[in-house]
Amino acid sequence: MLTSALPASTTQPAAQRAAEVPAMTRTESAALATAEVTRFVALMEALGPEDWAKPTPCTAWSVRDILAHQAGAYAGGASLREFLHQNGRPPKAGELAEDVANRIQLADRAGRGPAELLAELKAVWPQAVARRKQLAPVVGLITLPRPDGPGLNLGHLFTVIYARDTWMHRLDISRATGRAMQLTPEHDGRMVALVLRDLAANLGPKLGDAAVRFELSGAAGGAWVVGGSAAPSATVQMETLDFNIYASGRFSYAEARAKATLSGDTALAERALRATAVLY
């Protein structure tokens, strides 16, 4: 747990308004996705035979299952036919659209071992990244309703969420196998800043005029203000990767609260932390 923040005039790092984090361009998106899947592949290549069956924070998914999901997701990005195969069926009651695609990705690859799955991922990801960059302006005209929050713009899905999904699964596997996650401010810091940008869109309206400062420690961290135009009256401090695990739904509120330090208006900080959720 981090120590409480000291007076802003002496020690607090400069904070950026999360809503003002620059949006992702298509060119940057392709570069970020390329760097991320390259890191993901390198992690897969470093795993040993004992790692593939290990459980992960993704319910019912092993390390091998996450690799199958990523191979399937990039195969869907590389081929329209495969994309429609994965996404053309309506979800069941209580499911989200991505639950259907995920289930199909794993079912189609049920008999494949890690080496075959990794070979598939390597073969399809360059085309997937290129096609998503090409199609983002067109699909950006479409926003799909979601039962769990604001609608999902498909341009945002193509330019931001797919790369974020790979990034988050790299974190899942790093934690599951006890490996340190490769982190740099330029790459992972940008990933995290975009998470805070989305958090501002989701959480900001719920805070009204109030504002909360999020201080995330580590190589990919930083400080951001979420909420109204007023000066922040509360601070939430967490380690960056723990914050993303929580924001993605992999920690309960109780688990996140135990890892966070709240200061200032702690009631406001608790309200903000409870409502912290972002699509990954």
Predicted regions and their residues:
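Short, structured loop/turn "capping" segments at alpha-beta junctions
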Residues: 135-140, 180-183, 206
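C-terminal interaction segments
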Residues: 231-280
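Short, helix-capping/interhelical loops that line the mouth of catalytic, cofactor-
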Residues: 2-28, 75-134, 138-142, 280
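Short, contiguous alpha-helical
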Residues: 54-95, 144-203, 243
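An N-terminal domain-cap segment
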Residues: 20-68, 77-79
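Amphipathic, well-ordered alpha-helical segments in soluble domains
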Residues: 36-39, 43, 73, 124-127, ...
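Amphipathic alpha-helix face/heptad-repeat signature
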Residues: 29-36, 117-120, 124, 158-165, ...
